[in-house]
Amino acid sequence: MLTLRHTLQAMPAEALEQIEIFEGGNQQMKKTQTKPDIILIVLDTLRADRLSCYGYSRETSPYIDAFAAESTLFERAISPAQWTIPAHASIFTGEYPTTHLTTQIYDRHNREQIMLAEALRNVGYNTVSFCNNPLLGVVENDLDRGFEEVYLYGGALPNRPAIADARPRLTGRIAQRITRVMRSITRPIQDRFARDNFILRIAVIPWLVPLWQRYANFKGNTALSLRDIVGYLRTRRHKGAEQPLFTFINLMETHLPFSPPKRFIRRFAPYYRKERKAYRFMQSYNHKPFDWMMPLTEPLTEMQDRVLNDLYDAEVAYEDHLLRHLFAHLNRPSVRDNTLVIITSDHGEGLNRHDFVGHSLVAYDDLVRVPLIVRFPQQRYKGMRVSTPVSTRRIFHTALEAVGLQHTGLDNGRVESTLTNLETSSLTRTLNGGDPEGGIVFTEAYTPETLLTLIKNEDPERVAAFRCNLMRRAAYQGNYKLITVGDKPDELFDVVHDPDEMDNLIGDEPVVTAELEKLLTAFVEEAEKRRPANQEATRVGLDDELVAERLRGLGYIE
């Protein structure tokens, strides 16, 4: 099978230089000397329904709202997965999890599937990642493949761009080199800690949690990373860089634990410091990741629910506030006119809905309906709001179409399916009134196996009670959404009139249920066929002796 990777590698340099660019999704092609910069912002763990521009009653997001008003907003964007690793893998490959199979913390992405950063780098882009989530940089899963520069703010020993180093040049270079060496030593150790079931059981002990949350920079540093990003982009602009730039940004502010600044607590939870029960609950809950991830045996109390949701809103507002300087830079006419900006999330958060607080096992919209805001170069499609359901995996197709890559240049004119056809899978097709997928979208909730093992060890009765070991999938068409558990229809919702998914219609709509079940069956068959010939995601296996040697070198063991 001729793949995107093989085609890009075979293209001569002169052909890459003459790649044509689609203008706003039109059929006409227009040659240009300048490819657009691309900025992909993933606001980790952000629910769409907590942004004001998505209809939320509280003013949580004035800066995002203002940016959305100048852009295109997709009202029903669905993440292909319910947690970080498979969701990002789908964004980076344009594939659903059943195809890319990067679904577990110990999976390494298949090299036959080209990543977005690789594709852009192959056609002349500089590629840089600013990431706050350790699962995308510290864990060795290859999701950072294709990036020339990777700046990690999560995990031990964060690294920052040289422009952020205020020390004298020589001192700064020496310090950066030492940091790189230490990172090369500690990264396999951190990776082992992240995926070892025994270590995970120890790590969730409440009195140990604050230690790794702080010293392993669990949430990274949103404020610092955004400051560095703006500085990096401004410096590059002032230097007159000739190559186009792809910038990936992951921010973790809305992920537990919740600890927003006091000014945002006063706005959204003014009672928090005065009501001891509320304060003590949240301080304790922040240090109980096992409770975040586990299905709830009983709902939180009214007080607990209120403080959890209010502090989440405060975190949303704080992150929005921090984004203002980046938006100011992106709103410069010279930047705005030739930059594709995409804002989305990998998943949402349960927040005491449907028996969950976190984002691990289920496929409800609390977890998989995410924001998707796109500002095209020249602000094409400005102000449009799109109600057609779309998958965020189509970010991949949209970005590659924007730089001129289309199916006739990727697979010799052979279109294997609409899932790989960049010309028809780009979001611009939906904007032009003819959605290539007919408004049909899927999501897949692969159970994180490390979490499943933890639940089995800590509270095995919950596994059966909540069917934790069974995979969930969902299909969307029109107003309806069908959720299957273990490949059997389980719940049917009219998500337009029942957005909270409280009224299960599966007994009332047998025809709709059967149609959506048929779509899901066909989808899984097609997704499995689309895997590369050698496909099984590589299960990362560290050399235990190598890890032990590095632990000894750091003085952790003898």
Which role fits each region the language model picked out?
Residues 2-558:
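Catalytic domains that recognize anionic headgroups
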